[in-house]
Amino acid sequence: MKIGYIPTRRNNFSVEAALFYKKKIRQIIEVISPEIVDLEDINSEGLLWKQADVPKVIEKMRREQVDALFFPHCNFGSEGVVGQVAAALNVPVLLYGPRDDAPALDGMRDRDSQCGLFATGKVLRHHNVTFTYITNVAPDDMVFISGYEKFLRVVQVVKTV
């Protein structure tokens, strides 16, 4: 089974935080997923956020014949490009964003993954893309791990039908 690992970010939040969570989530799912197709050869960050990368991501995921797409929202996410990729590929979709930290004393945030997930869900519904999600928890939380494993089992069933 091949999983398209498509971590996403947004420009107005911390790139460093997005890169940190991209790596941390990948380390956890590598132990679970049979085969991961990532974006490391698409751009220098290995993250989806630029409109210009959408055709390259779609082409790569088709060429690799992924069975599902996993979109971790590493700092917020870019709902428009996520929606375009998901709609083009028509495979099971999983959304997840790590639990957000408390805002700094000045009210600023490095990330707002939960809000990004709401925005992405709305765009996916607009594109008639069926999706599921894992609750905002830390990537090493058993809720994330069991949710990811359940998604893989569903993908296996869909693949055999």
Place the predicted regions along the sequence by residue.
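An N-terminal assembly and electron-transfer interface module characteristic of large anaerobic redox
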Residues: 1-161
